Structures are given as C-alpha cells and as structure tokens.
A protein has these predicted regions:
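Phosphate-binding chemistry for phosphorylated carbohydrates and sugar-nucleotides
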Residues: 1-183
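Phosphate-binding and adjacent anionic-ligand microenvironments
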Residues: 65-66, 104-293
Length: 293
C-alpha cells in the first residue's frame, strides 16, 4: 500500500522503530515530534486537543490516508481520518471493529460501557461484540479467548490477540494500514457508516458502604428482565440498554444509556440517576442512627 501517513511520535521511543516498519510497508511518512526525549512533558487537556487538531490539519493538507498520534509508551493512539477529522476513541474503535470483522469473523471485546453501535456493527458483519468489565486489565484478560480478533479499553488502547495480548499502538498502525489496503476503503467512509445511536453518561456520588445496596436494589427491580451482569447491572430495553455500574476507585456510580432514540437515552439516565440518589438518601439516616447508638 503506497499510503501517505502522518505520525506524531510525541517524542517517544516509538520513533526509533516504526519508520522502518512503515518503509517496509511501502508507506510515505510525514513525522511530527520524532526526536526521542528522556522526559516527555505532560500537556493540559486544551493544549493536547489543540495539538491533535493541528495534526488533523496537516493530515488533510498533505492528503494523507491517516494521521496517528502515539503516546510515549507506545500503547495508545489517537487517529485522524483522511479528511483531517479527529476520531473520538469510540469512533476509532468502531472503525477498527468494522475493518477487523470484515477481514476475519470472530469476537470484538470492549468495556460493558461501550456504545450500542458496536453490537450493531458486529451483527451486520457476522461477528459478535462481547462486553467485559470496564478496567483495561479486564479487557486484556478477556482478550485471551481464541475467537477474539480485536479488543479495546475504549481509551485509545487496541489489542490484536493474534499478535500479542497487550495494547500496542505500533502494531495498530501497521494492522490498520494493512486492512485499509485490503478493503480499499477509507477511515472517513467507515466513520460515516457508524450506526447512529445516543450514548449518555451521568455520574452520581455513592458512599462506599452504600454501593452494595444500589446493586441489590437494581437486581430486585429487574428480577424478570433481561440483564447483563458483566460489570454493574445492564438492563436491556426495546431500543438499547441502560447500565448502572460502580466506579472501582471512587465513591461514584456511572449511569450510562445507549439507545437508538435520543429522548429515551436521556430519560433512562435521569430515571436511574434518581434511583441511585434515592438509595443513597435512604441509607444516610440509617448510617447516622448507627453512629448515634
């Protein structure tokens, strides 16, 4: 594939390895920040986003097939399509899911919080999307299953188990270029084909000691409904699902709805946010009573 590729190495050691690989793939590389540095300075979010947008402008200007920013450890990447549009992590995962399942039928793995669109893409292509627990480690453990063709933590980490069970940005770049060459399509074309769903998220405070009560309340409320307990409680509704899941590190609950209808997603998030708030409120007087006695 004689593709033109814009690569921002973020001054990481990847710059010492990837150019040779891409030359062997007959790619023309426009390198950015390619001088490896011992210490890579962290950027605040607004500076980083501006940095990515700049990469998008360059990608479009030089008519490259793809632009990729790779983090310093070489694990995660941010992808820009040929129009210069920065793909969100969800969009990048969706596009890569389409490429992976078009090439080989199997399973794609991602956190239970991943959008409904992934199940729809997998179904269209004769594959399966299988949810995992939300942490990156859980995604990698599940990726060891022999049928897995792609796994992602939803945060720019992509794992191709036929190569290695780890998040590897170098291999991701090489594999995506290979799949684009074989399919004859573009990232922008695939992005435009991502199913339109509404994905809403809310976060509610929940003391550690009340987290179990929230889970019990959810289970009691949905005893006869179709649920998935991979992480938290996911309740399936007519046009999607709502997930109530505890944060493993903070006293919080995530309420996430993914549906075809935008209004329905908003209503589900509000309904289940209110449920978490009410359980927390009911528990507070009881906790005070225990302290007083």
């Amino acid at each position: 594939a004689a593709f033109k590729v814009v690569l921002d190495y973020n001054n990481g050691a990847v710059a010492m390895v990837l150019p040779q690989i891409l030359r062997e793939l007959n790619c023309s590389v426009i390198p950015l920040n390619a001088a490896p540095a011992e210490i890579v300075m962290e950027q605040d979010d607004s500076t980083f986003q501006a940095h990515l947008q700049e990469m998008g402008v360059i990608t479009s200007a030089v008519k490259a097939k793809i632009g990729v920013f790779i983090d310093s450890p070489g694990e995660r990447c941010f992808i820009v399509d040929e129009t210069g549009t920065l793909l969100s992590h969800d969009q990048a995962f969706a596009v890569l899911t389409h490429l992976a399942l078009s090439a080989k039928k199997g399973m794609v793995l991602g956190p239970a919080s991943t959008s409904l669109a992934f199940s729809m893409i997998a179904e269209q292509l004769g594959g399966r999307f299988v949810p995992t627990k939300i942490t990156p480690g859980a995604v990698l453990r599940a990726a060891q299953h022999s049928e897995t063709v792609l796994a992602s933590d939803g945060g720019g980490g992509f794992c191709w188990p036929d190569f290695a069970v780890s998040f590897d940005a170098i291999f991701t770049v090489a594999r995506v270029l290979e799949l684009l060459a074989v399919s004859g399509t573009s990232l922008g074309a695939l992005r435009s084909r991502i199913p339109q769903v509404t994905h809403r998220t809310a976060v509610e405070f929940c003391p550690w000691e009340v987290k179990g009560r929230v889970m019990r309340t959810m289970m009691e409320r949905h005893l006869k409904d179709r649920v998935d307990l991979t992480d938290g409680v996911k309740v399936f509704v007519d046009d999607g699902w709502v997930l109530v899941a505890p944060d493993p590190d903070r006293p919080e609950y995530y309420i996430i709805a993914s549906t075809r209808d935008a209004g329905h997603a908003n209503r589900l998030v509000e309904e289940y946010s209110q449920l978490v708030r009410s359980v927390v409120a009911e528990a507070a007087p009881q906790a005070e009573a225990v302290v007083e006695t």
